[in-house]
Amino acid sequence: MAEQTLLSKLNALSQKVIPPASPSQASILTEEVIRNWPERSKTLCSDFTALESNDEKEDWLRTLFIELFDFINKNDENSPLKLSDVASFTNELVNHERQVSQASIVGKMFIAVSSTVPNINDLTTISLCKLIPSLHEELFKFSWISSKLLNKEQTTLLRHLLKKSKYELKKYNLLVENSVGYGQLVALLILAYYDPDNFSKVSAYLKEIYHIMGKYSLDSIRTLDVILNVSSQFITEGYKFFIALLRKSDSWPSSHVANNSNYSSLNEGGNMIAANIISFNLSQYNEEVDKENYERYMDMCCILLKNGFVNFYSIWDNVKPEMEFLQEYIQNLETELEEESTKGVENPLAMAAALSTENETDEDNALVVNDDVNMKDKISEETNADIESKGKQKTQQDILLFGKIKLLERLLIHGCVIPVIHVLKQYPKVLYVSESLSRYLGRVFEYLLNPLYTSMTSSGESKDMATALMITRIDNGILAHKPRLIHKYKTHEPFESLELNSSYVFYYSEWNSNLTPFASVNDLFENSHIYLSIIGPYLGRIPTLLSKISRIGVADIQKNHGSESLHVTIDKWIDYVRKFIFPATSLLQNNPIATSEVYELMKFFPFEKRYFIYNEMMTKLSQDILPLKVSFNKAEREAKSILKALSIDTIAKESRRFAKLISTNPLASLVPAVKQIENYDKVSELVVYTTKYFNDFAYDVLQFVLLLRLTYNRPAVQFDGVNQAMWVQRLSIFIAGLAKNCPNMDISNIITYILKTLHNGNIIAVSILKELIITVGGIRDLNEVNMKQLLMLNSGSPLKQYARHLIYDFRDDNSVISSRLTSFFTDQSAISEIILLLYTLNLKANTQNSHYKILSTRCDEMNTLLWSFIELIKHCLKGKAFEENVLPFVELNNRFHLSTPWTFHIWRDYLDNQLNSNENFSIDELIEGAEFSDVDLTKISKDLFTTFWRLSLYDIHFDKSLYDERKNALSGENTGHMSNRKKHLIQNQIKDILVTGISHQRAFKKTSEFISEKSNVWNKDCGEDQIKIFLQNCVVPRVLFSPSDALFSSFFIFMAFRTENLMSILNTCITSNILKTLLFCCTSSEAGNLGLFFTDVLKKLEKMRLNGDFNDQASRKLYEWHSVITEQVIDLLSEKNYMSIRNGIEFMKHVTSVFPVVKAHIQLVYTTLEENLINEEREDIKLPSSALIGHLKARLKDALELDEFCTLTEEEAEQKRIREMELEEIKNYETACQNEQKQVALRKQLELNKSQRLQNDPPKSVASGSAGLNSKDRYTYSRNEPVIPTKPSSSQWSYSKVTRHVDDINHYLATNHLQKAISLVENDDETRNLRKLSKQNMPIFDFRNSTLEIFERYFRTLIQNPQNPDFAEKIDSLKRYIKNISREPYPDTTSSYSEAAAPEYTKRSSRYSGNAGGKDGYGSSNYRGPSNDRSAPKNIKPISSYAHKRSELPTRPSKSKTYNDRSRALRPTGPDRGDGFDQRDNRLREEYKKNSSQRSQLRFPEKPFQEGKDSSKANPYQASSYKRDSPSENEEKPNKRFKKDETIRNKFQTQDYRNTRDSGAAHRANENQRYNGNRKSNTQALPQGPKGGNYVSRYQR
């Protein structure tokens, strides 16, 4: 019952799994197929035959038979498809093209489907089977129908045959079944392998094997398995015997030997049984235990494959892992490599999500709550990660050490190349899995290459090598020398090695038997497409092969050097390197030697081709090819890491590491390095230091990368459009550093870039050229060089070199590298071109539409650059080389219209050298034909013109003192501790100085004689027109050209012209008013040159005046010149444009040492400068103006009056006398006015003091205590003056006034002076609220909050726009400062010594109440003298002019004070009598700016004076006295005084002044002495004016 239920369930399940198909749902037996069965059956047979794999055929047959059985089960009699048709169709499927495998597949699927289709009709099935005889073989094997097809006799026979074949053993195939037989077989095999003559006994051993097999009925398959297993253990030494044994055995496929050297026959031939045995054994090895046995067995398999015993695919298809698994692993590995290639590319900050403020608290709580859970999750994640990583390692180990990958590796090692190449072509990404595959394939290629490499490269390198040393030993007591014996050992490692006296060679020497070496370079090119195309960039893992190919390429190009086929050969190698060699350099692991070998080949390529290869690698290959992408990313990250660690401390260690990385993979590592240089200043110097370890390949790529970055599309100027971008400057400095410190660095292409981009006026090219000249050439411009150094620079060679070192001009030290830099220009014939380009750019810079300041700066820069470049060329090129590389004088002048100063500057040194070396040389020969079109030679002598421009400062000036000074400096050096070599060097230097000094003196004498001879002619023709032409075309252009030329012009005109002509020239130059125009038009450097010229001229003229060479008329003329120059300078400085002021200051900076001389001129100049400073806002004008003013004022003490400079006329003398009298009268009048004002002020103050004393009577003050607070007319002492408003109005107060008011209150709150801050409040209601608040008892926190609320409300009533951000910032400051205040007791309820205490100890009143009526200096912590404190309110009108509207200090006595002397009048605080801090600070700043004559002269001093130590010991109370004598120097400094006053005030506040009541008499005595001790009479003397008294107080000053 249970069985029927189970069967019914299975039946129902099968129906669900395979539902009956209707013709409409059928995929093969559709209704159309059934209707046209005769034609469609043939099509179905063809479709079946077209299927290739067995899996596809099985699927197709399964579907077909399911549909057939479904159709047959319907029993449709009207159907055109009969059972016989189905049988015929099945026979056709089986017998189609007579393939046996078809019958097996069709039969098996027929049986399988018939067993699975539910509700099948057995009779119909049996009938169908009887009609298909071709399936009977399969039916008898597997189907239950076989019993229905046989009769009784056939069934009996079948049982007998089955019993005999299935259940009776004929051969033993298990070792345990016949251990004796298999044991003897193994023993025989071991004996055979140990037999040294086994190779000659192969037949005998094979016969014995057959004998054992027959004797013990051993199974042949198991016997073959045993032979293979045993032989694998002896494969190292016995592989030859093993192959010979198999060849003679029956197992050898003699009729169909496998051919594994042909792509088409890799799956044909061989012993299939042996292949299955080998595959099975390879799959059964335990990798952890049988690794060594597995490798030996694998090597045996490779030998069998190579000899054709088995075919490749019979092993490949059956060895683990399956291709699906391997491909999945490769895909995962590729994904990991992709992730690694993008590692560090994404910015983690850019991808990080910002956290909102609202969620921060929740997230923190969640972190706290879930801390334990997170820890557990983290531990579990780490555990899972470890397990996963171990699983990955296990999988990788299985794939690499066992199975298919291992098979490919060992096949390559044994020289079986074709199968491996076939697989790698089909699955090229297998190389990702194993690095060894590429190495082993490269080993094969290197074997093929070695004969060609030996024949083409130098083969005699090892002929001169010495033989190995002999070994000395004692044999049988005899000393003998024997050669070293090398022991050879066979190993399974493919690469031979030598260790000490042991040589390890590969055991299978026939591995290369099927390999044919290359015979020519063409063979190399042809076979590289086979081998290297598969290896790809992994060729970089075989650096020796890479080097050999590169050397062959070098030898091939050198062999064809000079032939017509050279270009063809180079083109072939360019393509070869581009495809095979260069991509492999990226995978070299820190091997700069290999890249150097590659570059030795690439050096023969044109740089355009090299740069194309570099660019292709950077932009395409490194992005498309995954191994290159990974390598590039790795190198880039490593370069960035080293750059971060690179510093001065680590440069010695990290530089070599960094250089090794860059020399190996420069394209990947130099780009981040150069970008780092662009962004940071200090990196450049470190990288330049590192570059000295680069190889040539890195230098070439570095030049390419620099050009790439220089031509990158980005702005070269900053946002202001004026200054160059920082990256341009940094790259320029870096390039210059490379050219200076790296002699192997080739910058020829950068020079080409400079040359080509200069045509477009590129600022980058200008910047690079400038840095090259400064850094490499060591050239320094002559701007800001003093006159002494200029003269030394134009002296003999020793002085010139010394002066150059003083100004940091290192051209002499950099001669070698500067000559190398010059060679880059000469190689491209670019010297004259660059000179003309820079000259043209200079002209264009003057015509641009920019601010004059910018144009001037650019013009100076371009002039300096051109001058420096010419100096570099003249220093490096001498004689013939200079003449060959620089355009002739005439061509520069006539064709290219180079200006006269530049043309002569270029050729002047060459002309001097030619004249000195060749006496017959004539300058006319050189300049003959030169057309000076801008010079009217009819009005000026050509001889004068050419002589003026040809000569240099060296020729016309000789100063012996310069040579003597240098000689004395060298002679004075302490030579006692010097070495002999250094002493000798100093002696030689002194000798050179003497020799060059004599030579210079001779040249100067020769020039002087020449000029003296020519001057006779020049002085004859010296009219006004000639002078103007001379000034216009000679003096002015050369003065503006350079500092040395400016001095030359001065020396020349003094040397070449007589005094009268000299005066005429100078008179025309000065009185023509060209100085002002010149200074406006010229640049800053040219203004300095003009200053040098006038400095020397005026210095010489002044020297002539002092020496008496000038008469009165000449002195008067000189004064007129000084006046004209002063007038022009003042006019220039009075201009509002920038150029006039700046150039005027620059001119005066040089001239001010000798000019002006007259005191009035100096005063005029510095007065003009001071007037300019009033409204000047430009810092580059203010700073030099201030310095110039100081210098001019310092010269006033040595300045001359006019009568000291020259004789005055009678009219001038009378005017001087009248002026002095008028000045004296003005001075007397001012003194009288001041005295009168002081007297009026003093009387006014005395009257005020008297009225205050009367009002401060104690009874009256108590009665009117509260009323005094609200009185609006108290203390009013001026009539008809407006009353101060009781309440500020926002409409009346300006914003600046409000902010100052807020700052004042904040100042006192910050220093905890709350009462002072309250006293500044201008609102009576708010003042009352604050006073009331200070009386209440409350916590300090509430007190501060309430105070803040009142102040903030008060401030907001003063301003129209409370939302103003500056005002809000002031309120924030108020909130911070309010935290500093503490509770201060109110005066009437607390200590008698408080801020506003009314009755205190007062001093006895003097006659004039001069010392009474106010708080004592010690008694008021608010006391301060006239203050310079700018934090006080600045918009409150003077108290002396208005009645007091603020709340006054309380006048009622303190409750705690018992002393009440009614005879003493209370000293009220007044505007001029001992004011407190709060009252004094409320005065206007303008009051303190008044003259001393306008202020009240009777004031208390700023600080109290404490008595000496004796009085302090006698009485603890220190009565402070006010010193009436001269104030100390410290009192003149408000800041120090203020600080000291605060210290004394704090000290007094800490004392207990209640103790002073016990010493009243003494106290009053001290007071009387203090106030009246210095009086000489009962009447106080009125203060004296500036002329009165011996002492002038600080207030009168």
From Swiss-Prot:
Q: Which residues form the signal peptide?
A: none
- Which InterPro entries does this chain map to? Tho2 (IPR040007), THO_THOC2_C (IPR021418), THO_THOC2_N (IPR021726), THOC2_N (IPR032302)
Q: Which superkingdom, per the lineage?
A: Eukaryota
Region span, Disordered:
1250-1274, 1384-1597
Annotated Basic and acidic residues bias: 1458-1490, 1500-1512, 1522-1545, 1554-1567
Q: What is its main location?
A: nucleus
- Where is the protein situated, by its record's location annotation? Nucleus
Offer one Pfam family short name for this entry.
THOC2_N
Keyword Repeat applies? no
Record has Transcription regulation as a keyword: yes
Coiled coil regions in record: none
**Keyword set for this entry?**
Nucleus, Transcription, Transcription regulation
The entry's function note states:
Component the THO subcomplex of the TREX complex, which operates in coupling transcription elongation to mRNA export. The THO complex is recruited to transcribed genes and moves along the gene with the elongating polymerase during transcription. THO is important for stabilizing nascent RNA in the RNA polymerase II elongation complex by preventing formation of DNA:RNA hybrids behind the elongating polymerase.
Miscellaneous comment text of the record: Present with 521 molecules/cell in log phase SD medium.
Q: Which family does it belong to?
A: Belongs to the THOC2 family.
The subunit field of the Swiss-Prot or TrEMBL record says: Component of the THO complex, which is composed of HPR1, MFT1, THO2 and THP2. Together with SUB2, TEX1 and YRA1, THO forms the transcription/export (TREX) complex. THO associates with DNA and RNA in vitro.
Name this polypeptide is given: THO complex subunit 2
Higher taxonomy: Eukaryota, Fungi, Dikarya, Ascomycota, Saccharomycotina
